[in-house]
Amino acid sequence: MLKQIIITGITNMSENFICISGYDKEGEKYIRPVLSQGQLTEQFLFAYNDNIQLGSILELDFIPPISASSPPHIEDTLFNQFSGRVLDKLNKKQFQEFIASIADRCVEDIFGYEIELFKGQPVLPQGAGNRSLGTIICRKCTIVIDHLGKARCDFID
């Protein structure tokens, strides 16, 4: 099933793995494209007709059912990794306006109220929560880089 998503997030994971998120305007929901075997790597960003970046409008062939994963990762959706094509890119102003149009009010609107602390970090237990992807326009945001070069973002919604 061909769907167009606007890329809203690209996250570096361990090694050269990445996680991407997109927003399906037609279905009005977030989608996290995932592979049936393995994880996406940085090469995915350069695999199609144009580089994938924030604001890219990407067409992928998703494998039904769309978003059949269990909470909180309800956005995880399998796709055919050889099907992609970048259709267009939002410019900076268009992307900012788009993000503002889909923003949630607060963390609880995205994740629900089941957030727990594990080793000092907020987590959602498997099977709990509304969803795992969302957008917040913060009142205050601080980015801290630790001694290992790892970045952490603290914010007030």
List PLM regions with ranges.
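OB-fold/S1-family single-stranded nucleic acid-binding modules
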Residues: 56, 61-157
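N-terminal ordered "arm"
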Residues: 1-60
